[in-house]
Amino acid sequence: MFAICDSGWVPVYLRWIYGIDRKQYCGPMIFKDLVAQGKHRMIFMGTNQKTLDSLQKELAKMNPDVMGMTFYELPFKTVDEFDYPAIAKMIEEDNADIVWVALGAPKQDFFMSLLKPHLKRGVMIGVGAAFNFYSGMGEKRAPEWVTRMHLEFIYRIMQSPKKQLKRCWGIVTSLPVMLYQEWRRKNKK
């Protein structure tokens, strides 16, 4: 098993609690690196067809092979309403090594966990807003100085307050308790 420090704060918490030094490697960074490598067959799922079409054109500048890959718009549904066996069959027939899922957190996480039992191969990676960032349609990632200061969440709240405030509130209200519990568990050893 491996874990990737997606949040800018995860490396900070690892350092505070365990003294472990890790760098952030978030979804958009992983996405760009793996697409540019050109070593894997990929399928891109989520968002809307307009964004997917623009994304395909932009990614082809990094990796021309992307033009022959599948970009699939997932219909707007709750996670319980998807036809997971049919989606898995499409992925299997595509022979994708990597399945990129952009439905936003936490929906994409639930989607992937429900799809996983139907897949025989490949790796699924939830990348949230990465499709929007790389589609060239206007949505940008926070400036580098903002991410270095671990304040990207504030930038994202300002970009789409209704969506992000709800998401961030859940994290802000549960994270201190989880961190304290982990700190206590670690110090009992």
Describe the function of each predicted region.
Residues 2, 41, 97-98, 123:
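Structural motif
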Residues 74-79, 120-159:
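Short, flexible loop segments at boundaries between secondary-structure elements
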Residues 11-90, 94:
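Conserved beta-alpha
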Residues 91, 95-100, 105, 121:
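Proline-aspartate-enriched helix->loop->beta-strand connector
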Residues 56, 109-118:
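Short Gly/Thr/Asp-enriched flexible loops that form oxyanion-binding sites at enzyme active sites
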Residues 12, 141-189:
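A transmembrane-helix-recognition feature enriched in membrane-embedded lipid enzymes
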Residues 2-6, 46:
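A short beta-strand/loop micro-motif in the catalytic core of glycosyltransferases
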Residues 9, 103-108, 130-131:
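Short glycine-rich anion-binding loops that position phosphate/pyrophosphate groups of nucleotides
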